[in-house]
Swiss-Prot record:
Monomer. Mg(2+) binds at D104. Its EC number is 2.7.7.77. This is Molybdenum cofactor guanylyltransferase. Keywords: Cytoplasm, GTP-binding, Magnesium, Metal-binding, Molybdenum cofactor biosynthesis, Nucleotide-binding, Transferase. GO terms for molecular function: GTP binding; metal ion binding; molybdenum cofactor guanylyltransferase activity. The keyword GTP-binding applies. It is found in: Cytoplasm. Its cofactor is Mg(2+). Gene3D superfamilies: Spore Coat Polysaccharide Biosynthesis Protein SpsA, Chain A. It catalyses: Mo-molybdopterin + GTP + H(+) = Mo-molybdopterin guanine dinucleotide + diphosphate. InterPro entries: MobA-like_NTP_Trfase, Molybde_CF_guanTrfase, Nucleotide-diphossugar_trans. It comes from Pseudomonas fluorescens (strain SBW25).
Amino acid sequence: MPIDSSPLPCSVLLLSGGRGQRMGGQDKGLLEWRGQPLIAHLQRLARPLTDDLIISCNRNPERYADYADQLVNDDSPDFPGPLAGIRAGLAAARHEHLLILPCDVPHIDAPLLADLRETARRNLLLPVMVRHGEFWEPLICIIPTRLRAAVEDAWHAGERSPRKIFLQLGGVGLECPADDPRLANLNTPQLLQTPSGVSE
């Protein structure tokens, strides 16, 4: 029987529901970088990968609607962190795997996502996270939606760290270079204003 080498079908969740503290409380996904909102850069990358593009947003749904097939929001009003958006995405996802990306990593490219999907295809029952050096990136990951109940259990037990939960569930790492520029977070006004979007 031939080995299936087709890309892993995924729903995609773009996380844009945070408080934006480092941005002065602004809605980070709508801030402009290179002439477009951050969310537009991620949407353009993710759109070819799925027929189920979900955006987690807690503000301005009318501005996000054109970028998504579904919008979700947290079930708590106090910006409880990215795990709340992940929970909402897992509940809404139409495929058996959910690829998760934060809105502030516009340097992410298609080859990295292809590697992530291939690693997930080889580890169908486990969360797969990007890892660079000693650091895990739990918000750049693919998680089987069948793990939703385990994530819910951890949430109700008080855990709020996606990294801890995914590692407890047997998380696998996609190794990237320690200084991989594709993983740069544009999470301050200064980084948004630099030409490269990478700190000097």
